Regions:
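A helix-coil-helix interface module used to build multimeric assemblies
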Residues: 2-196, 202, 208-215, 275-276, ...
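Membrane-water interface at loop-to-transmembrane-helix junctions
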Residues: 234-239, 287
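Long, amphipathic alpha-helical stalk/connector segments used for oligomerization, subunit docking
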Residues: 297-308
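Structured ligand/cofactor/substrate-binding pocket environments in proteins
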Residues: 31-36, 237-263, 267
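Short Ser/Thr-interspersed hydrophobic loop/turn segments at strand-loop and sheet-helix junctions
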Residues: 91-93, 254-258, 295, 299
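Acidic/histidine-rich catalytic neighborhood
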Residues: 266-284
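A short, charged helix-loop
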Residues: 214-230
Length: 308
C-alpha cells in the first residue's frame, strides 16, 4: 500500500484531487521552475544584465527542453534542494555552453522554487474559486427548493427548535461564500515573485535589482513584493490557512450529512454509492466521510506548515 491514499491507484477516486493534482507533481514543479528561469533570462537580457542573444536562447530552451525528474534524484539527495540539479541538467540539455553559462544568473534556489510554487498556487486557487462557484450554485438551488421543508435543528446532537432544510443547506454555503471571496482576494492582490539572490540582498542581480524584480513579476503575472521574503513565510501561510478553512467548512458539511443519513434518522438519502460487502441494506455515506477525513488531514497539515 502506498504511504498516502493520494498516491494509491485503487483509492484515487475516493480522494480525487481532480485537475489540482496535476499541479503538484514532480514534472509540474520542474516545468514551473523552468518557466521562471526562462522569464528571468528574458528580463535580464532586456536590462543588459546578460547578453540578449543568450537570454533568447535560454528562454527558448525553457519552453523546449524536457528534464526527467528521475535524473535529479541523486543530486537533490546530496544538495537538499532540487534547483542545483535542475540548473545543471538544464545547462546540459541546452547544448550551448556559451549561452547556458548565463542561466540562473544571480538567482538562488529559493527564488526559483518559491516563484515556481506561486505560479502553481495561482492555478490551484483559480481552480478552487471555479469549483466553489459550482458548489455554491448547487447549494443555492437546493436551499431555495427546500426553503419551506421543516426539520429539527440540533444543538449538542439533541433536538432544539424547528428549522428548515433550506436553512441547513444555507449554513453549509455561508462559510464557502466567504472563503470564495478570500481566495479571490488572494488572487486579486497577486501572488508574490521572489528574486533576492543568495543572501536576500539582490547584490548579484545587476545595477538595478528592484527594476529587475519588478520586470520579472510583470513577465510572470505575479506581484512585486518590494523586498525579499526568503525568511517571511506569511504569504505561504495565508494561502495554507485559506485552503484549510475551505477543507474544514466542507468537513462540517460532511459531518452533518453523515448524521442525517444514519439509521433511525434518515433525514437524508444519498445516491447509489456506499455499498457494504456483507449487509445489503446499508448505504454508507462514503463521500461525506471522505470530506470529514480530508478536513482533519488538512488541519494537521496546516499545523505542520505553521511550524515549518
Amino acid at each position: 500500500m502506498p504511504a498516502t491514499p493520494f498516491d494509491s491507484v485503487h483509492l484515487s477516486r475516493l480522494f480525487d484531487a481532480g485537475e489540482t493534482a496535476r499541479l503538484f507533481t514532480d514534472s509540474a514543479e520542474i516545468r514551473a521552475m523552468m518557466i521562471v528561469e526562462g522569464a528571468l533570462a528574458q528580463v535580464q537580457g532586456a536590462q543588459g544584465v546578460i547578453p540578449e542573444l543568450s537570454a533568447a536562447a535560454i528562454h527558448r530552451a525553457s519552453l523546449e527542453c524536457q528534464i526527467d525528474p528521475v535524473s535529479l534524484a541523486r543530486a537533490t539527495g546530496a544538495n537538499g534542494v532540487s534547483t542545483p540539479a535542475l540548473v545543471a541538467a538544464f545547462r546540459e540539455a541546452m547544448q550551448a555552453p556559451e549561452h547556458a553559462q548565463y542561466l540562473h544568473w544571480g538567482a538562488t534556489s529559493q527564488d526559483i522554487q518559491d516563484t515556481g510554487l506561486m505560479l502553481r498556487l495561482r492555478q490551484a486557487l483559480t481552480g478552487f474559486v471555479a469549483q466553489l462557484d459550482q458548489v455554491l450554485a448547487a447549494l443555492a438551488q437546493l436551499a431555495q427548493t427546500h426553503a419551506e421543508l421543516p426539520m429539527a435543528a440540533r444543538t449538542y446532537g439533541q433536538h432544539a427548535t424547528p428549522t428548515s432544510f433550506g436553512a441547513q443547506v444555507a449554513s453549509w454555503g455561508w462559510p464557502l461564500l466567504e472563503l470564495r471571496a478570500d481566495l479571490q482576494g488572494l488572487l486579486d492582490a497577486g501572488l508574490p515573485v521572489s528574486l533576492s539572490g543568495a543572501a536576500g540582498t539582490a547584490a548579484e542581480l545587476g545595477a538595478d535589482p528592484a527594476a529587475l524584480r519588478a520586470a520579472l513579476a510583470a513577465k510572470l503575472g505575479l506581484r512585486d513584493p518590494g523586498r525579499s521574503w526568503h525568511t517571511d513565510r506569511a504569504r505561504v501561510l495565508r494561502i495554507g490557512d485559506a485552503v484549510t478553512r475551505m477543507a474544514l467548512a466542507l468537513g462540517k458539511w460532511g459531518e452533518d450529512v453523515t448524521l442525517a443519513t444514519q439509521s433511525g434518522l434518515a433525514e437524508l438519502r444519498l445516491g447509489g454509492a456506499g455499498a457494504s460487502s456483507t449487509m445489503p441494506q446499508k448505504q454508507n455515506p462514503v463521500v461525506p466521510s471522505a470530506m470529514v477525513a480530508l478536513a482533519r488531514h488538512a488541519g494537521g497539515l496546516n499545523a505542520t506548515l505553521q511550524g515549518a
